[in-house]
């Protein structure tokens, strides 16, 4: 089980990483991304997996770990030294450190040790390099303990350390050979011995082998401790010859081996497992002793393998049954795993492999007390850290991959017990596989040192353990836990002293596999602040969100991801670097090697106080495509000035290469601005421009420059600056003198400090309510080279020139505005197409000090449109979403009153039930809260909209005659037999700009007399597509049009009497629903039911057909003239003059006599009957 670092992804593409292309777009501060120094190596070797900056007497270097050097045959790994300096172009040199990295007295396996996976510099000189997959062999077993080497400043291995142990899988093996005469050929036995012994690791601390030969007698060919290597044993075995004999004393040979060969005098080791291999070709002559001899072997725990050679029996054609049973009885249980038989001596070699494997299987169980691995698979050196006098070595594979931290100090080595770091009780032998020691670090606090180790698989969410060393014992102080399963919280640890007081300020914990919202491995870094001996959570850092697009089907995707997994793995590397931006605080660099589809990127965070700023100061992407340039940001180191300019430089590695980025110095530029005069007094003109008096102002701007790294030296900076007048306004109220421009741009060389002067003048604008802001922007003339501007200081400064205020002797103007509002309508507004406007009258008064920039702001509902303004003086109104009217110039004095009207027009696209208007009066002067109650007015007026339409009605017949001699048909075959048809037409046509509502048209007509006889019979109706009329039951209710016949009896006709009018007739109504349309039509067909009128007594009467229109929308109304239409159809009977009743004749005669009498009386009164001529003649 080999833990993998999160970014150690399988590399399948061979490439050379030319990091000179790492010039991608970045948010830039003072790390120079365009002039970096690059180092390249095979991506298959994982060149760049680790990087360290290094200096010795020979010069300055970048050390680069390449843990897969030697692949594909082996993965030995190594470290390269790469010379640095702007003038250095020498290639990187492989140090061949694995050659001299060795542990004596063990059988080493270096082929896949991945040397260079861990690389840290020693503060006292030299460096430490580790190969966590270094292994040694115990018998047939390989133990991956890991190894670390101290390397001197001159790149020589000083010593190596690995937690190797004496092989606890030692075996003492005695081979008991039948050397009787029947064994033939003896060379086959020798070949068997050679093949078997070659498979064994023979030595004093490993497996020992002795050989006993028997026939009639027993001989010790050599003892267990005779030879100390496999080679020596092989030479001796090849010299053994067959001693012969006429008897096969198997019991004697086994018993002699038990009693003598397994004694300490002959080299047997106390506590080591005893193994006996018996090889014979025939039944024993002392088989009566075998049972007891085998029992004695059992009592002494001697494991026995027995081999029966059947050659003698096969050659003599003898039965082998009894022989096989005897040899089986010799073998240990289970017999099937300890007994072998071969057809003859030549076949012995065929069982060597199986026999060897079964013997080797005993190695794993040689230590019967070992229930699990301890340090055998520890992978010590998976991580490493120097902490004062201690060296911390992470051993993730220790104790069944629960892990531990090996502490090494001079000649003292502390390997904590397997339960030392268990923070919670666990079941016996429970395999936690927490990977403790995945990363290690330390924190310095006043008077003490805290040691920190990460175990990213603990409880699946990860954990960080903080502990102290007290007299060689581990004392756990605190644990920090991750929040997300599988995030690998604790796989990366970094401590940093931000303020350079020699004490740790922060602990940063990486969780590079932290999943984002879209299940992508975005990564997260947790920041903890040191509080005495405890760490307290402060904040989390996250990368730019990566969009994972497996295809371009998603509209948000512009580029398809070609590599998996997707994300950033932000926090794969977290490095504390010395003060990059020369602000007195150390900084942090974090790697995100999966960003940009595995191209990678790093983020730089600047220190501040005792913490770091949450927002990154610079992001450096690799600029690669994720194929030829992979995982930039896998490793980071930044502790040294490698080019002699006094600034810390940063080395960043990935798979296939590394790059050294130079830091650029930081220029501090401070600017001050002064104005003369310092206020704009529009009533005091001090200059003349183009013949007009105005106000002119002189602006003095002073630049002060210095370098952060060399504050005492003189610095000359080439600057470019731009001055913008009235920068808060879209239209400027001022221009530079001699121009009509609001902006000027100039270059300036500043040596320590320099002042310049620019003058400008005010325009004749009516807008003086706020200050004139003057903005000065500046930058270095060549921002790509040399120092950069300090990002802690602004590169833009602002100066404000206020307007002088008319407040007497007061420093502040305190106004008191009032607002009165009235409207033409208050209760209900009926809006018509020809009359869709209304007025709002405003009165603004100031009862306090002068109010500067007095204005009214009018907000109104969407059903209103600003149309215009009337009667306002001096100023005007602007309308965007609201209406702002400036009142007074430039201020509204005490007692001033301004009256004006705002005209609104109704918006036909928004028909609301109310017109809502909010009006307020305000100014730039102060106004007490208690006087603001009369500065606002709210208006809400109900609104109805009168729909403009034309409602027409007409009929095909207005007069129908019934002949006196007409008869009633006895059988009605069609509607033509009933009477004349009357077609009634209704047309509704839209007019005006208001929308047409849904309408309801009710068409009513006399349908039956009071006695139930038909009057007007509806045969059907038609309409335009937007109209739906009901009920259908009124349409031809008798089914005449469908061919149904009906008869009228004479008795029914005789019942009809006189019809004077139709006031008592029963009315039928057709209701039509009209959807909005420019034109709607409804046509109704009616038949005058003549049988009702033929025998009736009447001379003439009128039938009235009414059409009534109604709006279905409460906001849209109809005018009274457009609601009803009536059509009169006159019915008369020809040939029968109407008889006048007697009472009518008598009443008319009386009325005529009365009128005559009144006329005579009136004439008499006026003297009409007097003769004035007669009187004159009498006189």
Curated annotation (Swiss-Prot):
* Positions that bind Ca(2+) 1: 497, 499, 501, 505
In this entry, the parts of the chain located on the Cytoplasmic side of the membrane are: 1165-1179
The FG-GAP repeats are at: 30-91, 101-160, 365-417, 422-474, 475-537, 556-614, 618-678
Annotated signal peptide? 1-28
tRNA-binding as a keyword? no
**GO (cellular component) term, any one:** focal adhesion
Disulfide bonds, paired cysteine numbers = 82-92, 687-696, 702-755, 807-813, 877-885, 1029-1062, 1065-1072
Matching entries from InterPro entries are given as: FG-GAP, Int_alpha_beta-p, Integrin_alpha, Integrin_alpha_C_CS, Integrin_alpha_Ig-like_1, Integrin_alpha_Ig-like_2, Integrin_alpha_Ig-like_3, Integrin_alpha_N
Motif GFFKR motif at which residues?
A: 1167-1171
Residue intervals on the Extracellular side: 29-1141
Against CDD domains, the record matches this protein to:
vWA_integrins_alpha_subunit (cd01469)
Query: Which compartment or compartments is the protein found in?
Result: Membrane
**Entry's transmembrane regions:** 1142-1164
The entry's free-text remark on domains says: The integrin I-domain (insert) is a VWFA domain. Integrins with I-domains do not undergo protease cleavage.
Which family is this sequence assigned to?
A: Belongs to the integrin alpha chain family.
Q: How does it assemble?
A: Heterodimer of an alpha and a beta subunit. Alpha-1 associates with beta-1. Interacts with RAB21. Interacts (via cytoplasmic domain) with PTPN2; activates PTPN2 phosphatase activity towards EGFR and negatively regulates EGF signaling.
What protein does this entry describe? Integrin alpha-1
What organism does the UniProt record list as the source? Mus musculus (Mouse)
């Amino acid at each position: 089980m080999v833990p993998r670092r999160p970014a150690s992804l399988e590399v399948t593409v061979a490439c050379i990483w030319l990091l000179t292309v790492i010039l991608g777009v970045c948010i830039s501060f003072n790390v120079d991304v365009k002039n970096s120094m690059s180092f390249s190596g095979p991506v298959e070797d994982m060149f760049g997996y680790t990087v360290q900056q290094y200096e010795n007497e020979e010069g300055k270097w970048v050390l680069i770990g390449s843990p897969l050097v030697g692949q594909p045959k082996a993965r030995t790994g190594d470290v390269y030294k790469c010379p640095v300096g702007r003038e250095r172009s020498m290639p990187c040199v492989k140090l061949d450190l694995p050659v001299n990295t060795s542990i004596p007295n063990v059988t080493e396996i270096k082929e896949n040790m991945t040397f260079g996976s861990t690389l840290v510099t020693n503060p006292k000189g030299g460096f430490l390099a580790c190969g966590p997959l270094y292994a040694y062999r115990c018998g047939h077993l390989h133990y991956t303990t890991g190894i670390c080497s101290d390397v001197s400043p001159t790149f020589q291995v000083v010593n190596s350390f690995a937690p190797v142990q004496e092989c606890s899988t030692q075996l003492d093996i005695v081979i008991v050979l039948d050397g009787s005469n029947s064994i033939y050929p003896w060379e086959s036995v020798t070949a068997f011995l050679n093949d078997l012994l070659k498979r064994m690791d023979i030595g004093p601390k490993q497996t020992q082998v002795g050989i006993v030969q028997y026939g009639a007698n027993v001989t010790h060919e050599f003892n267990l401790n005779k030879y100390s290597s496999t080679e020596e044993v092989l030479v001796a075995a090849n010299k053994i010859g067959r001693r012969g004999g006429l008897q096969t004393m198997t019991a004697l040979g086994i018993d002699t081996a038990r009693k003598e060969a397994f004694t300490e005098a002959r080299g047997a080791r106390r506590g080591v497992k005893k193994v006996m291999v018996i090889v014979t070709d025939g039944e024993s002559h002392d088989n009566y002793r075998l049972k007891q001899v085998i029992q004695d072997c059992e009592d002494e725990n001697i494991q026995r393998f027995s081999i029966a050679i059947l050659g003698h029996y096969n050659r003599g054609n003898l039965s082998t049954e009894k022989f096989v049973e005897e040899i089986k009885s010799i073998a240990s249980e289970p017999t099937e795993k300890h007994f072998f038989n071969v057809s003859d001596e030549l076949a012995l070699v065929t069982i060597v492999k199986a026999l060897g494997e079964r013997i080797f299987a005993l190695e794993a169980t040689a230590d019967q007390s070992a229930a699990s691995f301890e340090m055998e698979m520890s992978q010590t050196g998976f991580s490493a850290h120097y902490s004062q006098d201690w060296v911390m070595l992470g051993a993730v594979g220790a104790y069944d991959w629960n892990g531990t931290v090996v502490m090494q100090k001079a000649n003292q080595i502390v390997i904590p017990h397997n339960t030392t770091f268990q923070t919670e009780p666990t079941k016996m032998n429970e395999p936690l596989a927490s990977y403790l020691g995945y990363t290690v670090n330390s924190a310095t606090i006043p008077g003490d040192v805290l040691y920190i180790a990460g175990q990213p698989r603990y409880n699946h969410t990860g954990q960080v353990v903080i502990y102290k060393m007290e007299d060689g014992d581990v004392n756990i102080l605190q644990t920090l836990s991750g929040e997300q399963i599988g995030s690998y919280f604790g796989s990366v640890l970094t401590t940093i002293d931000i303020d350079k007081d020699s004490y740790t300020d922060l602990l940063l914990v990486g969780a590079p596999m932290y999943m984002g919202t879209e299940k992508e491995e975005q990564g997260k870094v947790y920041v903890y602040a040191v509080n005495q001996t405890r760490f307290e959570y402060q904040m989390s850092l996250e990368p730019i969100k990566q969009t994972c697009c497996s295809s371009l089907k998603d509209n948000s995707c512009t580029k398809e991801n070609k590599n998996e997994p997707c994300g950033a793995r932000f926090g794969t590397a977290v490095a504390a670097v010395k003060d990059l931006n020369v602000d007195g605080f150390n900084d942090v660099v974090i790697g995100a090697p999966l960003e940009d589809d595995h191209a990678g990127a790093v983020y730089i965070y600047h220190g501040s106080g005792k913490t770091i700023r949450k927002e990154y100061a610079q992001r450096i992407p690799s600029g690669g495509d994720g194929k030829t340039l992979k995982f930039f940001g896998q490793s980071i180191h930044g502790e040294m000035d490698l080019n002699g300019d006094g600034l810390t430089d940063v080395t960043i590695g990935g798979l296939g290469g590394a790059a050294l980025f130079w830091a650029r110095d930081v220029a501090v530029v401070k600017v001050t601005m002064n104005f003369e005069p310092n206020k704009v007094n529009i009533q005091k003109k001090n200059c003349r421009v183009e013949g007009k008096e105005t106000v002119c102002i002189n602006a003095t701007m002073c630049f002060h420059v210095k370098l952060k790294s060399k504050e005492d030296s003189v610095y000359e900076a080439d600057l470019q600056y731009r001055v913008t007048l009235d920068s808060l306004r879209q239209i400027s109220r001022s221009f530079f003198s001699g121009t009509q421009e609001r902006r000027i741009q100039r270059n300036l060389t500043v040596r320590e400090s320099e002042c310049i002067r620019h003058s400008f003048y005010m325009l004749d604008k009516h807008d003086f309510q706020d200050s004139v802001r003057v903005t000065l922007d500046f930058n270095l003339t060549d921002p790509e080279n040399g120092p950069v501007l300090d990002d802690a200081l602004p590169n833009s400064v602002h100066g404000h020139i206020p307007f002088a205020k008319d407040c007497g002797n007061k420093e502040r103007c305190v106004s008191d505005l009032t607002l009165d509002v009235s409207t033409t309508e208050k209760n209900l507004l009926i809006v018509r197409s020809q009359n869709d406007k209304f007025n709002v009258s405003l009165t603004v008064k100031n009862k306090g000090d002068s109010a500067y920039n007095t204005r009214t702001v009018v907000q109104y509902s969407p059903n209103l449109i600003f149309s215009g303004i009337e009667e306002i003086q001096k100023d005007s109104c602007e309308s965007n979403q609201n209406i702002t009217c400036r009142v007074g110039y430039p201020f509204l004095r005490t007692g001033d009153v301004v009256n004006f009207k705002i005209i609104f027009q109704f918006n036909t696209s928004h028909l609301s039930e109310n017109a809502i208007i909010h009006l307020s009066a305000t100014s730039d002067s102060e106004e007490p809260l208690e006087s603001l109650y009369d500065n606002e007015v709210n208006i809400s007026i109900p609104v109805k909209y009168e729909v403009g339409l034309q409602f027409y009605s007409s009929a095909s017949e207005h007069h129908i005659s019934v002949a006196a001699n007409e008869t009633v048909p006895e059988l009605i075959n069609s509607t033509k037999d009933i009477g004349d048809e009357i077609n009634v037409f209704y047309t509704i046509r839209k007019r005006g700009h208001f929308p047409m509502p849904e309408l309801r048209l009710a068409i009513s007509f006399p349908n039956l007399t009071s006695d139930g006889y038909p009057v007007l019979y509806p045969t059907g109706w038609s309409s335009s597509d937007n109209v739906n009329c009901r009920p259908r039951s009124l349409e031809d209710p008798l089914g005449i049009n469908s061919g149904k016949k009906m008869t009228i009896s004479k008795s029914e006709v005789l019942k009809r009497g006189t019809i004077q009018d139709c006031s008592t007739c029963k009315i039928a109504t057709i209701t039509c629903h009209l959807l909005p349309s420019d034109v709607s039509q409804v046509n109704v067909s009616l038949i005058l039911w003549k049988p009702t009128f033929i025998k009736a007594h009447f001379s003439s009467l009128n039938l009235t057909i009414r059409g009534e229109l109604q709006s279905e929308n409460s906001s849209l109304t109809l005018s009274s003239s457009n609601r009803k239409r009536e059509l009169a159809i006159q019915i008369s009977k020809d040939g029968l003059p109407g008889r006048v009743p007697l009472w009518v004749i008598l009443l008319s005669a009386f009325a005529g006599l009365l009128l005559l009498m009144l006329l005579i009386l009136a004439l008499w009164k006026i003297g009409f009957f007097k003769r004035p001529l007669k009187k004159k003649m009498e006189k």
